[in-house]
Regions:
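Conserved phosphate-binding elements of NTP-dependent enzyme cores
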Residues: 1-939
Length: 939
């Protein structure tokens, strides 16, 4: 078998027709500057071709249900194995997905509880034992005399299928009636069931009237039912509540029966286990009054109510018509702060009133007076949410919603019968609420009887193995019940990595995208050991990574570069780490060997002497902490994964400031008080989300330089002669754009069983504009030519137009000189998108009162890119602004003016402030993991 993956002529995106050989069954790291072509080679070429080959082996019918897979632009790839991609995308936004379900641990837990779980009475918590037929007969006979009942034998419960044989067998056995999905059918008629729907089938064994002398017949009928159903009987009480009895489990005191324990009883995604009140979600979403009225010190006239459609306060608005009617009816002033209004009146504004109010109709609606009820702002939003078919409207209203626990199951998702089954004294919900670390310890110390051990040995082995894998990738602080949608990209990737190890596949090509993201240096060694274990199983690992420790641990390194974008796309180096350290042409080698370094600042900023102070922060695992954030400094919030950094910065500080300064509709996490907001004028969160989701979004439109370029073209003599305004040069509006492709430059061609093809528009040849618009030139270049220029070329071209040159130079300063001015947003990496946002902030006039918040800005960045990023962040802080960063990268941490270190551990073991101060002060703290790893970087 070939021992290499041989790639010839790879040209995807910016790759320059490269040839490369990668050893199989090795731990291979691909590195290079952001935008150099690493992902283009690893994901868009190698993985894409592996997936495409697999999909082409399937039938056309199967391919119809799978996503499209384009053939990458490469001549050939030999030696390719089946490929599995583990990228940074969040696992699932489905509220039913949890850490337990994604890792399959929850499936094993359900099986464990079904096999060795001990049922208890949901009322008295007494351990439940089996019921005898005599006990069941006595309880049925206790029904009121004259009550009509039917004895039903369940033969199918909530399963898909047609069940023709079962129905035929019932007919031949002499039964006359059957209840299917709640409807009674005569067995003599032809019954056809939908095989794709779940059905419940119950045979009507007997029909009785409760009276003296029926015990003998009832006993015989129950024995018949139990012989058919396996110990379960459903008593259909005519005009009464249905009863279920089991020979298996029942509480003698409260007559509560529990069906035979099965895995589906413990599934919140199955109606047989899910809480019927919340259908297994554990929470309800509702309009939150605190989001509708975020600042209760404002009056109605000052805009206390922020809801969509209810915040227009002009005299002629419909909202003001309603508000005035309420004020007149209840004798209040619309200038009174909302918090000072009587509670009854506050509720009228929010929830409406059945009392008829006098509305003075505005002139535009015909004038006059009308009498009617007011449904209330919250009720109005809920009605609009249910009735609207517009995703935009629904998303807008969802921004006013928050979640509350289901009052029935208290957020546990399961029905009370399922929650009354325990193993080791804990029900399944209590067990999944433990952290992975505590759950692992629970199974280490679990005392079972000899019989229970025999039954559960293999199940517990699988559970412990999977919990161990999660511990080894640094996720021991997560709860198994944690919603998958709340995980960061790095966390979800490491969960999938742990799941893959659990599957024990061999001969597979795994492609990973920066698995170290979000991981503290302390946990990095465990992650590297996990990846090596995956390799030792007989797999090939290709890891796109910038982390020094990961590169040093690799068997083979491929360095793509030398620059980024048009300056990248070549293989600068391919070989072992030892050879890379000696390679003078590799920027990676320069930083890894220490030939180049990010310097430690000679002195730290003193700040402006003012503070943003947070008191009593208690969101998630934060333990009622107080923290002072010095303003006018570059600040890093550090700590191991799960220590509470995001809870403090993103959930509390950012959301509170966004509401206070930017009038955002967000609900901040739990805290008592935040002071010092008056020292700030705005908060800006600079993340790695795309700058736009369509090809029409690009760096020029995002930074605003495109507006200046369009205005410049409108001032040319050609444009003036034709009467063109700046709008003529927009590809988002009719007039100047090519209407064949509506300004996209490409047209989608559907190929049905083959992938859709995106072809350049035949009319404009991909230039986006019509012929007349492209005839307008500035210095010999059309608007399309300008958009095709790199930023570096643009700076030279517009050097005499300061307004344009200044904005383009800020893109240069953040290291984006290689990207095209009009490069589609969809082709920018996360790091590139973040730097476009940073450049936009740099181009604005500094007020010195802005706080910038960045969550791991080094994601996807090479050491050389990190160097440039630090210079940009320092410029923002030099202008008197505050820069607050959540970061694990020690090169960033060492240049900070102030560090807030949380810990000591993750999850329940975190949420406290270990130490605050300069990097030099942090390294003196013996309890700080950050301090230990930071020390060598300051020497």
């Amino acid at each position: 078998m070939i021992d290499k993956i041989i790639i010839k002529g790879a040209r995807e995106h910016n790759l320059k027709d490269i040839d490369l050989e990668i050893p199989r069954d090795k731990f291979v790291v691909m590195t290079g500057l952001s935008g150099s072509g690493k992902s283009s080679l690893a994901f868009d070429t190698i993985y894409a071709d592996g997936q495409r080959r697999y999909m082409e082996s399937l039938s056309s019918y199967a391919r119809m249900f799978l996503g499209q897979m384009e053939k990458p632009d490469v001549d050939s790839i030999d030696g390719l194995s089946p490929a599995i991609s583990i990228d940074q995308k969040t696992t699932s936004k489905n509220p039913r997905s949890t850490v337990g379900t994604v890792t399959e641990i929850y499936d094993y837990l359900r099986l464990l509880y079904a096999r060795i779980g001990i049922p208890h009475c949901p009322v008295c918590n007494r351990e439940i034992t089996q019921q005898t037929i005599d006990q069941i007969v006595d309880q049925i006979c206790d029904l009121e005399s004259g009550t009509k009942i039917q004895l039903l034998a369940p033969i199918v419960r909530g399963r898909k299928g047609k069940y023709t044989k079962e129905l035929e067998h019932a007919r031949k056995s002499g039964y006359v009636r059957v209840r299917i999905d709640g409807i009674i059918y005569d067995l003599s008629e032809e019954i056809t069931l939908d095989k794709n729907k779940k059905h419940t089938i119950e045979i009507v064994v007997d029909r009785l009237v409760i009276k003296e002398g029926i015990k003998s017949r009832l006993t015989d009928s129950l024995e018949t039912v139990f012989s058919i159903s396996g110990g379960i009987v459903t008593i259909d009480v005519i005009d009464g509540e249905e009863l279920t009895f089991s020979q298996n489990y029942a509480c003698p005191e409260h007559n509560i029966s529990i069906e035979e324990l099965t895995p589906r009883m413990f599934s919140f995604n199955n109606p047989f286990g899910a809480c019927p009140h919340c259908t297994g979600l554990g929470v309800f979403r509702h309009i939150d009054p605190d989001i509708i009225v975020p600042n209760k010190n404002l009056s109605i006239r000052e805009g206390a109510i922020k809801a969509s459609g209810w915040n227009t306060l002009d005299k002629g608005s419909v909202a003001m018509m309603y508000y005035t009617a309420i004020a007149n009816e209840y004798g209040i002033s619309l200038d009174t702060p909302f918090c000072e209004l009587p509670e009854e009146v506050q509720n009228v504004f929010l929830y409406g009133t059945d009392q008829k109010l006098e509305f003075k109709i505005i002139e535009s609606f015909g004038g006059g007076v009308r009498y009617g009820k007011f449904e209330g702002v919250i009720n109005n939003l809920e009605r609009r949410y249910k009735e609207s078919n517009s995703s935009y409207s629904r998303n807008e209203i969802e921004s006013y919603m928050s979640e509350t626990l289901c009052p029935e199951c208290k957020g546990n998702r399961l029905k009370k019968e399922s929650l009354s089954v325990t193993v080791g004294g804990l029900n399944i919900s209590q067990l999944t609420a433990l952290s992975v670390r505590d759950c692992f310890d629970f199974f280490e110390n679990l005392n079972l009887t000899e019989r229970q051990q025999f039954i559960s040995r293999q199940i517990i082995k699988e559970i412990r193995e999977r919990l161990g894998f999660l511990k080894n990738v640094g996720l021991d602080y997560l709860n198994l019940s944690r919603s998958a949608g709340t995980l960061s990209g790095g966390e979800s990737q490491r969960i999938r990595l742990a799941t893959q190890i659990g599957s024990s596949l061999t001969g597979v090509l795994y492609i990973l995208d920066e698995p170290s993201i979000g991981l503290h240096q302390r946990d990095n060694d465990k992650l590297i050991a996990t990846m090596k274990r995956l390799r030792d199983l007989g797999n090939t690992l290709i890891v796109v990574e910038h982390d020094d420790d990961t590169m040093l641990a690799a068997d083979y390194i491929v360095d793509i570069g030398p620059g980024a974008g048009v300056n990248g796309g070549n293989v600068v180096f391919a070989g072992t780490v030892d050879k890379l350290l000696k390679c003078k042409n590799s920027v990676t080698g320069d930083y890894l060997s220490g030939r180049k370094k990010i310097p430690v600042p000679a002195k730290r900023r003193k700040g402006n002497g003012k503070f943003l102070s947070v008191k009593g922060a208690s969101e998630h695992n934060l333990k009622n902490i107080n923290v002072d954030i010095p303003l006018g400094k570059l600040i890093c919030v550090t700590g191991v994964s799960g220590s509470g950094k995001s809870s403090l910065v993103n959930e509390i500080i950012y959301k509170h400031l966004a509401c206070k300064l930017n009038r955002a509709k967000l609900k901040a996490g739990n805290f008592k008080e935040i002071t010092g907001c008056e020292h700030l004028d705005k908060v800006i969160n600079i993340d790695q989300s795309p700058i736009g989701r369509t090809p029409r979004s690009n760096p020029a439109t995002y930074t605003g330089v495109f507006t200046d370029i369009r205005e410049l073209f409108a001032q040319t003599s050609d444009a003036k002669a034709r009467g063109y305004s700046s709008g003529r040069f927009s590809f988002n509006t009719k007039g100047g754009r090519c209407e064949a492709c509506e300004g996209d430059g490409i047209i989608k061609i559907e190929m049905h069983f083959l992938p859709d093809i995106y072809a350049p528009c035949e009319v404009c040849k991909g230039k986006r504009y019509n012929r007349e618009t492209l005839e307008v030139h500035y210095k010999g270049k059309s608007i399309h030519d300008v958009l095709e220029m790199t930023v570096d070329e643009g700076v030279q071209f517009f050097e005499h137009i300061p307004k344009i040159a200044r904005k383009l130079k800020t893109l240069q300063e953040v290291g984006l000189g290689y990207i095209k001015i009009g490069q589609p947003a969809t082709t920018l990496s996360g790091g590139e998108a973040q730097r476009v946002k940073l450049s936009t902030e740099l181009s604005k006039r500094a007020t010195g009162k802005t706080i910038y918040i960045l969550d791991e800005p080094t994601t996807g960045l090479h050491n050389a890119d990190v160097h440039k990023l630090i210079e940009v962040l320092q410029k923002l802080a030099d202008s008197g602004n505050t820069v607050l960063i959540i970061e694990h990268n020690l090169n960033v941490i060492k240049v900070a003016d102030h560090i807030i270190d949380l810990g000591k551990e993750g999850g329940d073991g975190g949420g406290e402030i270990l130490v605050c101060g300069t990097p030099e002060e942090i390294v003196k703290c013996e309890d700080s993991y950050t301090g230990r790893y930071l020390k060598p970087y300051l020497e």
